[in-house]
Amino acid sequence: MTPTLVRHHLSHAGSPPRVNLGARARDWSEIQERMLVPLYETVHERLEVGPATRLLGLRCGSGLALLMAATRGAAVTGVDSSPERLALARERLLPDPAPGARARGRAARIVEGTPRDAADAQAPAYNLITAFDPIGCRADDAGRLGDLLAEATPLAEVGAAVVLAGWGPPERCATSSVLRVAARLADPLRSAGSWRPARRDDLEEVAQRAGLRIDGSGRVSCPFGYADVDSAVRGLLSTGLFDAGISATDEEQVGKEVAEALHPHRRADGTVWMPNVFRYLIARVR
């Protein structure tokens, strides 16, 4: 159960944190990615995603949102910089057919790299771009999303919808109290990628800088629920939001701090439950 939730950014001095990227990708796919399913469903319903949709998913991760769009009949392309997550996306969207079986549905494309690498001169322009990896928790995430949009929007037709997602107000997101651990542990590095509270106009500012026309917005309840504290720690670390703290200390120390911060959200049966609200913005390509 999502951006992100903001993922695979480099830590201070450009060096990656000391983590097992394969294990982290599996934790993202198996634990954390589904947390944003209500967001995906709401957007797909509102925009009537279906057989006429040609979708480009930015930071598509292990492909759950793409799979949900594909089951509605959309032609989907996903792009991401994480080979570990994309390997899982390919397993979901491009499974090996059984011998003699006929392929069902429309083919998906999974692209490693940047949006520019998803260009296909032989295919029609995209009419929907999604950036479901939520911004609003890192000092540098809006700028990074802007860079992706600068490459992606030329691949879309005029009037195409562009969906941006972000964390809601800290007071509406119980997970914010846990994410403050990231800021405290990363503080010695003064890292540009460390956590910060979401701001009200984060999404609007990104859309305006990208030259998009704002066309609507909404809020969606996306509670984070975990079977136990260990699953919660693994899921949250898989987002990448704690990478600066891991670089400043180590993964074990960060895990202990996160587990302690989760105690107020632990229920009598051992499960962890944190209500959150996420925002989405719909903009249009001019």
Residue map of PLM features:
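Conserved class I S-adenosyl-L-methionine
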Residues: M1-T53, R85-L88, P95-A98, R104
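Conserved Class I S-adenosyl-L-methionine
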Residues: P3, S62-L64, E204-R286
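Class I SAM-dependent methyltransferase SAM/SAH-binding core
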Residues: R54-L56, S62-A119
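A short acidic, Gly/Pro-enriched loop at the edge of an enzyme's catalytic core
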Residues: R116-I129
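Residues lining the SAM
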Residues: A131-I135, A165
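A short, conserved alpha-helix within the catalytic core of class I
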Residues: C137-E151
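Helix-to-beta-strand junctions that scaffold the AdoMet/dcAdoMet cofactor pocket
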Residues: A139-D140, A156-V158
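Conserved catalytic/acceptor-binding region of the Class I
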Residues: D147, T153, G159-G225
